[in-house]
Amino acid sequence: MASHSGPSTSVLFLFCCLGGWLASHTLPVRLLRPSDDVQKIVEELQSLSKMLLKDVEEEKGVLVSQNYTLPCLSPDAQPPNNIHSPAIRAYLKTIRQLDNKSVIDEIIEHLDKLIFQDAPETNISVPTDTHECKRFILTISQQFSECMDLALKSLTSGAQQATT
């Protein structure tokens, strides 16, 4: 085989290097701007979380517990990747086993769309007492609703900062 050297080889080499450099340096900017799809999913999750909370709050005599905490946002990520979808999904799957509501299936479906990478399944310890189960469901539902409010604010403020 004959080796060709000349201006076309240098240009091709430069083009390949420049393309890789541009791709690696523009990627973080693209991640900071939430796509319309992610924002629509989070808006839908926010609406569904309100429906779930309203449904759960109809149970009289159940109070929120300080014993349960839903991990909401990942501290080391930027919007839209900062929603801790795998952990939230695990909690809602647990709630679905205790109280099978159709809205929970919808929420899990939307959360699946937000999981950008394979994450280990979070293990949730479930209370065994019936009343404590109701407190668990109410507490996690309330925290999930607050989380979606926070996530949507995070997305919209991140989008505004990216445009300025």
From Swiss-Prot:
Give the range the annotation lists for the signal sequence.
Answer: 1-23
Q: Upper taxonomic classification of the species?
A: Eukaryota, Metazoa, Chordata, Craniata, Vertebrata
One Pfam family per UniProt: IL31
State the Gene Ontology terms under molecular function: cytokine activity; cytokine receptor binding
GO BP:
immune system process
User: Which InterPro entries does the annotation name?
Assistant: IL-31
Q: What is this protein called?
A: Interleukin-31
**Localized where?**
Secreted
Q: What's in the GO CC field?
A: extracellular region; extracellular space
Q: What does this chain do?
A: Activates STAT3 and possibly STAT1 and STAT5 through the IL31 heterodimeric receptor composed of IL31RA and OSMR. May function in skin immunity. Enhances myeloid progenitor cell survival in vitro. Induces RETNLA and serum amyloid A protein expression in macrophages.
Residues modified by glycosylation: 67, 100
Coiled-coil zones = none
Q: What induces it?
A: Up-regulated in skin homing T-cells of patients with atopic dermatitis (AD) and in activated circulating T-cells. Up-regulated in lesional biopsies of patients with allergic contact dermatitis (ACD).
Query: Which UniProt keywords are listed?
Result: Cytokine, Glycoprotein, Immunity, Secreted, Signal
Instruction: List the expressing tissues.
Output: Detected at low levels in testis, bone marrow, skeletal muscle, kidney, colon, thymus, small intestine and trachea.
